[in-house]
Amino acid sequence: DVPKDARRMHKKPIPRLGGLAIYGGFLCSILIFGQLDETMLCVLLGAAIIVALGIFDDVLALGAKLKFVVQIVAAAIPVCIGDLQIGLFTNLNPLSDTPFVHLGILAVPATIIWIVGITNAVNLIDGLDGLAVGVSSIAAITMLAVALLTGNMPIAITMAALAGACIGFMPYNLNPAKIFMGDTGSTFLGYMLATVSIMGLFKFYAVISFAVPFLILGLPIFDTANAIIRRVAAGR
């Protein structure tokens, strides 16, 4: 990453394909220790597409529309093929006797929006050294703890692999950063956190499903909303 303006925190060129190290570390761990059912294989396929897109974007600077379309495709794979969907969530209306709200035909688009939204949310906070990988580490460790407490070992193994990859990369990304994760790493982390949060929380523990992912990923979600508002206000 070559600093081209005064807004850049770094003054010297810094490699920005560090996300490949995160992805490689995670993939090795999950292939050795993970439990690869159809849903997880679909998630890994979608993640591979996200990583490939990130590499091309880091090297060639792809257009936003193309990236958005590819991200939708990557999100649709586990949703449509792996049956990874937000089918219901807790009804927060105190006047209603219905404990859950069923999304029905809206489950597929709602889940794709969730995955693409969180993928880009983590990408947008990757502006300061160590911020995105730090937030992702905290989110992964929190999901790991929830999975262990609820006895969901496949999710626990997945989150342990993701947290380990993040923590291993973190010393090289803290200020002053020696390497950046680039879009390759940030979008991969966002994609994995978004998909696994559905697998581990939404489908099996509906009571905490809506609250926990938003609490864990609150910083990138609100940062994304703030960035969108600022860009719209500035006419960009």
Language-model segment annotations:
Residues 23-52, 93, 131-236:
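Alpha-helical transmembrane segments
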Residues 1-106, 110, 207-236:
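N-terminal transmembrane signal-anchor/hairpin module of polytopic inner-membrane proteins
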Residues 1, 50-63, 116-129, 167-180:
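C-terminal ends of transmembrane helices
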Residues 98-141:
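Hydrophobic, well-ordered secondary-structure scaffolds
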